[in-house]
Amino acid sequence: MTKVVVCALYKFVSLPHFESIRAPLLAMMEQAEVKGTLLLASEGINGTVAGNQEAIEALLAWLNNQNGLDNIVYKLSFDDEMPFYRTKVKLKNEIVTMGVEGIDPLKVVGTYVKPKDWNALISDPDVILVDTRNDYEVQIGTFKNAINPVTETFREFPEYVKQNLDPVKHKKVAMFCTGGIRCEKSTAYLKEQGFEEVYHLEGGILKYLEEVKQEESLWEGECFVFDNRVAVNHELKKGQYDQCNACRMPITEAEKRSPAYVQGVSCPHCVDKISDEQRKRFVERERQVNLAKARNEAHIGSDVNQVIEARREKKEALRKLAAQKNKLKQTGTV
């Protein structure tokens, strides 16, 4: 069986005319049968895609020929099945959303640490090690002795820093994330807040797992990934977790044996949180998925990323509305 190549990539670079890249990039991906999602913004490009080796090589070559997108940071892993259903190129305000204006990794960023040097750094008792990922990611794996900020989204990270880290008290701070992109912004943010010695794992967890031998590794557990593999082990192969299509939380085989678990409808993490309307919708979606499987067809609507994106768009709309209300209150017009 031909292996599917999964490529996680990003680059912070000034792209003032990023909108014009979308159409030719999407056309190239569709022609090469590359699936997945790439985000474009004025600050760069980010995303994870998959295809056969020839297709991924063609995409990387195409990007390398675009002004500013050469020498892109990417990491490869492999799977037996295609982890994405669709091909998308989206235009965004940020390629990774922190929600703080003026944070620019092109101007200031932390010190990059190679995977081979990471163990020595985080073994230093004077170093504070912070996992910048979301809580559901941390729960299935992290580095030994890492602090979990218990955030639901990356937008919450600045508040965590404000409440828990002090540039006077915490002289050395090391941070890490899945592929490195969130650390670009988190270290830039800490530098802006006056922290002097700020470090981050170059290439992220995925690069560390690729380059550091398991017997020498300080990584514990599996690494959550944002595709249908859910998580990868130290060999960068699909791990032991599945994902609840209702709430996107990773779930174990033991949790799937719980009475709260209904495939495609609920799990122990969300059974008490979803509404009756949502439950009905999830039941119908699962019925459609099973019908599609019986006909040996792909049911696009079963893609959990579609649910995630809808939630993100709803949250963003609510944030904008709240910001508008606050602005009106400050100006005394309400």
Swiss-Prot record:
Aminoacyl-tRNA synthetase listed as a keyword: no
Instruction: Please list the reactions this protein catalyses.
Output: uridine(34) in tRNA + AH2 + O2 = 5-hydroxyuridine(34) in tRNA + A + H2O
Give a yes or no for keyword tRNA processing in this entry. yes
The biological process GO terms on file are: tRNA modification
| Active site residues per record | 177 (cysteine persulfide intermediate)
Task: Name the job this protein performs.
Answer: Catalyzes oxygen-dependent 5-hydroxyuridine (ho5U) modification at position 34 in tRNAs.
Sample GO molecular function, one term: oxidoreductase activity, acting on paired donors, with incorporation or reduction of molecular oxygen
Q: What is this protein called?
A: tRNA uridine(34) hydroxylase
Key words of the record: Oxidoreductase, tRNA processing
Q: What is its EC number?
A: 1.14.-.-
Organism per entry: Shewanella sp. (strain W3-18-1)
Query: What residue stretches are annotated with the Rhodanese domain?
Result: 123-217
What's a Pfam family this protein contains? Rhodanese
Family assignment?
Answer: Belongs to the TrhO family.
